[in-house]
Amino acid sequence: QEKEKGSSHMTKADTCARYCADMAWSLVTIPAGSKAPRAMGWQRPEQAISTADAAREYWTANPDHNVGLLHSASGTVALDIDNVEWTRIIFEGLGLDYDALMASAPRIVGRADRGKVLFRAPRNLDLSRRAISWPNPETGKSEVVLEFRAGAVQDVLPPSIHPDTGNPYTWAGRSVWDGLPDLPAPILTIWREWDRFRPQMMDLCPWKPAPEFKPARKPRPPSDRASAIEGFNAAHDIHATLERYGYNRCGRSDRYLSPN
């Protein structure tokens, strides 16, 4: 596993302080053994830890707690790969180079069969979380393939401990301390035009059930009753008919008073 140069000797408190000082990131606190924040209102930027002193103080006092990156307050976004094999199918279908994208940015590794790459968020664009799910061919249950993560969401950062493996999250790919690259234009296009690209990504699923053929419904022929009513209305003036049956017209208006 690739390791971040110069970070192996740092304590968690030192690393978190450096995230704030060097990267200008806003961090959220996560209890030990978890990937989810529990503090009330953790999604609000004002609740996040954003200074080196505050980060060092908190994680010195709570060294076993995990740490998360709050995207909305940090100017960051992430592409989260939950299924590498299926994501490769999508990328190939869209003409994208999966390996080149993974190598172009810092990558968080929690488990060997997954990946998460971080990018700088585009300015003046309000991106939100999006996800593609495919049915598992063995279970039939829907499973997330990949997520586009932005806004009031967080991602666990190294050196937090993964609750399932018991091992620390690590950095791979491009060095995080060199800064984050801009979100690649093709990924941004997919994100911004989600309603156009989502159906394409869903259709790329090799085992997607074929749509059930439903023959077009034949138009119903007009009924005899409808034809009789239309014929009567065409042959008779409505005003003359009402007056014949005793209705009294109100002046020159189209209103009539009942004879009863």
Tell where the protein language model's regions lie, with residue ranges.
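Amphipathic alpha-helical segments
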Residues: 93-95, 233-245
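Short cysteine-rich clusters marking metal-coordination/redox-active sites
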Residues: 258-260
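ATP-binding catalytic core of ATPases
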Residues: 225, 232-233
